[in-house]
Amino acid sequence: MTHQTHAYHMVNPSPWPLTGALSALLMTSGLAMWFHFNSSMLLSLGMLTNLLTMYQWWRDIVREGTFQGHHTSIVQKGLRYGMVLFIISEIFFFAGFFWAFYHSSLAPTPELGGCWPPTGIHPLNPLEVPLLNTAVLLASGVSITWAHHSLMEGNRVQMLQALLITITLGLYFTLLQASEYFETSFTISDGVYGSTFFMATGFHGLHVIIGSTFLTVCFFRQLSFHFTSNHHFGFEAAAWYWHFVDVVWLFLYVSIYWWGSYSFSIDPMQLTSN
């Protein structure tokens, strides 16, 4: 091994970008086969190889940063920029769902009955399970901040307690969201309301599951003493991601659950005259 005279991480050759690309190809091809031929075998294979690739790739990153010392302050700065750009891309991802919802609801077409929610759709009560979900996620935002401050102060026990509370609240939110889906009187195939509702809330639920997994990994890493008060970007990235999930839910609650549940109609004569 040659002597390194700079603070940058020169990565070693890795098979994971190639296996990740191949698994993504299998997943997208498998998704098309599932839609058209009702066969989920290729999709399952793609998901399995993708999960294995992610596990082994992130395992190598943990080894490089925690045990080999490659994540210097300059490298961590680059990782922070990368995480910020990733969250920005996620913002635009969800912006598409909000755009579709408001485009359809602010000027409902005659096919929808000229009203919103569309004729025949009975929206969920925003003051029941959605409000409880909001309280759960806001509480999880408080507990993850508590965990972060405890880590900064070197209080390992409180950090683990707060992190476990956050993970539990994330699991509780997921269970509430799943129970809510079973109670809805509409499905994803019930026009534009059903498709935008389930796409937006479903992808948010997927992000909650991903964030909970991220935090669970951080919990076990903290049990193994991987984090210190000045070297914990893995946890910091998970906390940023969780706060992003919180903020997206607030927009979802206000837009889709609260504002979108109030009925209003448009006079068809006004549409034709304009």
From Swiss-Prot:
Family annotation (InterPro entries): Cyt_c/ubiquinol_Oxase_su3, Cyt_c_oxase_su3_dom, Cyt_c_oxidase-like_su3, Cyt_c_oxidase_su3-like_sf, Cyt_c_oxidase_su3_a-hlx
Keywords: Membrane, Mitochondrion, Mitochondrion inner membrane, Translocase, Transmembrane, Transmembrane helix
GO terms of biological process kind: mitochondrial electron transport, cytochrome c to oxygen; respiratory chain complex IV assembly
Single GO molecular function: cytochrome-c oxidase activity
Catalytic activity of the protein: 4 Fe(II)-[cytochrome c] + O2 + 8 H(+)(in) = 4 Fe(III)-[cytochrome c] + 2 H2O + 4 H(+)(out)
Record PROSITE patterns: COX3
GO CC term, one of those recorded: mitochondrial inner membrane
Ranges annotated as spanning the membrane: 16-34, 41-66, 73-105, 129-152, 156-183, 191-223, 233-256
S-S pairs: none
Pfam families in alphabetical order: COX3 (PF00510)
Superkingdom as given in the UniProt entry: Eukaryota
Mitochondrial matrix side: 1-15, 67-72, 153-155, 224-232
EC number(s) reported in the record: 7.1.1.9
Mitochondrial intermembrane side: 35-40, 106-128, 184-190, 257-274
Entry's localization field: Mitochondrion inner membrane
Gene3D superfamilies the UniProt entry points to: 1.10.287.70, Cytochrome c oxidase, subunit III, four-helix bundle
Broadest EC class assigned to this enzyme: translocase
Family: Belongs to the cytochrome c oxidase subunit 3 family.
Subunit record text: Component of the cytochrome c oxidase (complex IV, CIV), a multisubunit enzyme composed of 14 subunits. The complex is composed of a catalytic core of 3 subunits MT-CO1, MT-CO2 and MT-CO3, encoded in the mitochondrial DNA, and 11 supernumerary subunits COX4I, COX5A, COX5B, COX6A, COX6B, COX6C, COX7A, COX7B, COX7C, COX8 and NDUFA4, which are encoded in the nuclear genome.
Function according to Swiss-Prot or TrEMBL: Component of the cytochrome c oxidase, the last enzyme in the mitochondrial electron transport chain which drives oxidative phosphorylation. The respiratory chain contains 3 multisubunit complexes succinate dehydrogenase (complex II, CII), ubiquinol-cytochrome c oxidoreductase (cytochrome b-c1 complex, complex III, CIII) and cytochrome c oxidase (complex IV, CIV), that cooperate to transfer electrons derived from NADH and succinate to molecular oxygen, creating an electrochemical gradient over the inner membrane that drives transmembrane transport and the ATP synthase.
Protein name: Cytochrome c oxidase subunit 3
Organism: Lemur catta
Gene: MT-CO3
